[in-house]
Regions:
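Polybasic, glycine- and aromatic-enriched phosphate-binding surface used to engage nucleic acids
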Residues: 1-106, 111-117, 122-134
């Protein structure tokens, strides 16, 4: 949907930035394993969003955006979010325990488990709590 820039009343400079968004309301219920977040989206320049979405981060290019999304879809990332997130609403505070990565590359759970030295038991626990994202 096109909107005239004059109707953008807040954070107008963000319109000119590349960003990764996620829905502020997460899917699912109380059953395990949880999904934690909806599918993240890459938004190019000349895009804006309403309160329905949360801007996770600004990126330099589409490749960095795709790599951030690859990180966000890992069980590791979503498990770290789940340590704080206790409602379906997602706020910036739920990312407090999520470590920042190098977004010049994509990420997998296996790489993250190795990077942070997780044991087989810790990995099994994470994978029992967080469902894979497609």
């Amino acid at each position: 949907v096109f909107i005239e820039p004059r109707y953008i009343t807040k954070n107008i400079a963000w319109k000119d930035k590349k960003k990764v968004l996620v829905s502020k309301a997460s899917p699912g219920g109380d059953e395990y394993p949880h999904s934690i977040i909806s599918t993240p989206l890459y938004a190019d320049v000349n895009t804006v969003c309403t309160e329905t979405y949360l801007i996770v981060d600004f990126v330099n290019n589409k490749i960095e955006g795709q790599n951030l999304i690859s990180y966000m879809t890992t069980r590791f990332f979503r498990f770290m979010m789940s340590l704080i997130k206790n409602t379906q609403n997602i706020s910036k505070g739920v990312f407090a325990f999520v470590p920042i990565q190098d977004y010049s590359k994509s990420w997998t759970d296996e790489e993250l488990y190795a990077k942070y030295g997780l044991t087989k038991e810790e990995i099994a626990f994470i994978e029992s709590m967080i469902r894979p994202m497609k």
